Swiss-Prot record:
Family classification: Belongs to the cytochrome P450 family.
EC numbers, comma separated: 1.14.-.-
Alphabetically ordered keywords of this record: Heme, Iron, Membrane, Metal-binding, Monooxygenase, Oxidoreductase, Transmembrane, Transmembrane helix
Protein name: Probable cytochrome P450 524A1
Cofactor(s), names only, from the UniProt record: heme
PANTHER family: C-22 STEROL DESATURASE ERG5, CYTOCHROME P450 26
Matching CDD domains: CYP61_CYP710
Topology class, membrane: Single-pass membrane protein
Keyword Lyase attached: no
Subcellular location: Membrane
Transmembrane residue ranges: 8-28
One Gene Ontology molecular-function label: oxidoreductase activity
Gene source species: Dictyostelium discoideum
């Protein structure tokens, strides 16, 4: 809030207070005088005594009128500020004071999106008294992702939970240096080493689903647990005791709750519990890293992402080594878990539902896998790369149901986007990944689930590359893109070849609910059994 704005609000509030104090004191004049004569006091003390007596004489009506005046003043000022900021940009004709369009965004998100899209590629709105730009055009979205002065905006409590050591809060040269350190963790060799872990955990969980398949299985709940098991397995290795991996999962879920709560850091609050869970995760990872440093120093074979990172560090020539502190590893892992847990869970759930709704596409996946692995051989990267149709299905799942439909940014300086649109400092910018994926003039027939769009004839992965924003763009482009796509492909492959499942629809269950990521409203209930 700029200084003149502060003075304006203070002036109005003081004026309102003066009016009511004056009126109240006039009614109790003699009584107040008598009271102050009986009690000797200093000037300040007498003033306070008068004020206390005056306030005590307010009627309920006066108090209510005062509250109305204050709220009306704030609301009018909010409208004035928004009018100044929006300029000639299109947007809603009226925005409710204080909360803005928050409730529309929460309770009727599709209606909110549709209205904003009709305003054009860039439109304005207001959420919780925050001036917001809603961007639907793919090219302008890319510009926002790449803009150095537009920073990721996670949540009000995110920095308290993850701390400024986490990847989303690192910028400039330190961020580039960290990404350079991370590259060896996503090479072909690294991805190949993670694959057996991913496959074994998927097999284990699908077997449990089949065992419990006589009753409805909720895909969202089960995919959440599966995805967390894979994350902990890849990051710390299956050689880490199961009790430790369970402790990581338990504390992560508590920490994750803190990103959507009120930013009140007091004992017993959700935010404080989230911070305490992060502290516990730091302790767990510190112990795991110490053991990894010893094993890799002894020349043992890497069994996890942490092992690979430590091994690469130890094998670098000393003059090329960057410092590899425990904090660097730990807060990078926490960033990975934060970024991937809900997003990948969303993609796995949509895999289950979309394949149940498109049996013809599922049949083609099965036919391709049967030709590549006739004896149900273990997966390897070479075979997975040959499964072109399966990979097209994965790409279409991510296009058709992008896990995060928008990625909020906040600009730390005045910037210009699109067709010379000036964005004042402190504006929240919402680049809509959903809108980019369904933009007219982008993907052909975008509302149709059609993996064939990515084949060698249509090549929409090339011709519509600008519209694909599921992994972001710019300095924070998802470095784990291939690991994430592999995880979905492994899940799709194993689910398709080892099970038969039916989607048990519920009234309204197919509606999409919006949070940080999207899910079907009922979480997708299925009945599942082993496939002959």
């Amino acid at each position: 809030m700029k200084t003149p704005t502060k003075y304006f609000i203070i002036f109005i509030l003081l004026a309102a207070l003066a009016v009511f104090v004056s009126e109240a004191t006039s009614k109790v004049g003699q009584q107040t005088t008598t009271t102050t004569q009986q009690v000797k006091c200093s000037g300040l003390q007498c003033t306070l005594n008068k004020l206390i007596v005056a306030v005590g004489k307010f009627t309920i009506k006066q108090i209510l009128v005062g509250i109305v005046i204050v709220l009306a003043t704030i609301a009018l000022h909010q409208q004035y500020v928004i009018t100044q900021k929006k300029g000639s940009l299109p947007g809603p004709s009226f925005v409710p004071p204080f909360f803005g369009m928050l409730f529309q965004l929460i309770f009727t998100p599709f209606s909110f999106y549709e209205k904003q899209e009709k305003y054009g590629p860039i439109s304005w709105t207001s959420i919780m008294n925050k001036f917001v730009l809603f961007v639907t055009d793919a090219e302008i979205n890319r510009q926002v992702f790449k803009e150095e002065n537009a920073k990721l905006y996670l949540s009000l409590g995110a920095k308290k939970i993850l701390t400024e050591k986490a990847i989303p809060f690192i910028e400039g040269a330190p961020h580039r240096q960290l990404r350079k350190q991370l590259l060896p963790l996503f090479t072909i060799r690294a991805l190949s080493s993670y694959l057996p872990i991913q496959e074994s955990i998927v097999d284990e969980h699908i077997a449990m689903w089949i065992k419990n398949g006589k009753a409805d299985i909720n895909a969202r709940n089960n995919c959440r647990d599966l995805n967390m098991a894979i994350s902990t397995g890849v990051f710390v290795g299956n050689n880490t005791p199961e009790s430790v991996r369970d402790d990581i999962a338990k504390n992560f879920f508590v920490m994750n709750e803190g990103f959507l709560c009120l930013p009140i850091d007091l004992p017993g609050t959700t935010l404080r519990k989230a911070i305490n869970a992060r502290v516990r995760l730091v302790e767990i990872f510190t112990d795991i890293i110490a053991k990894s440093r010893k094993r890799m120093g002894d020349g043992e074979k890497p069994q996890s992402l942490i092992d690979l990172w430590v091994e690469h560090f130890l094998n670098c020539p000393e003059e090329e080594r960057d410092e590899l502190s425990n904090d660097t590893i730990i807060f990078t892992l926490l960033s990975f878990m934060f970024a991937s847990q809900d997003a990948l869970t969303s993609s796995l759930v949509w895999t289950v539902q979309l394949m149940a709704e498109h049996p013809d596409i599922l049949a083609k996946v099965r036919a391709e896998q049967a030709s590549l692995r006739p004896n149900n051989e273990k997966l390897d990267l070479d075979t997975m790369r040959q499964a072109t149709y399966t990979r097209m299905v994965v790409s279409e799942i991510l296009r058709f149901r992008p896990p995060a439909v928008m990625v909020p940014h906040e600009n730390i300086e005045d910037i210009v986007i699109g067709d010379n649109v000036h964005v004042p400092k402190g504006t929240m910018i919402l680049p809509s990944i959903w809108s980019a994926h369904f933009q007219e003039g982008g993907y052909s027939d975008p509302y149709k689930f059609d993996p064939q769009r990515f084949d060698s004839v249509r090549k929409e992965d090339v011709t519509c590359a600008k519209n694909s924003l599921v992994f972001g763009a710019g300095p924070h482009f998802c470095i784990g893109k291939e690991l994430a796509k592999n995880q979905i492909e492994v899940f799709l492959t194993k689910l398709a070849m080892s099970t038969e499942w039916t989607h048990n629809k519920t009234p309204g269950g197919d509606e999409i609910i919006f949070g940080p990521t999207i899910f079907p409203k009922d979480g997708c209930n299925i009945t599942i059994k082993a496939r002959n």
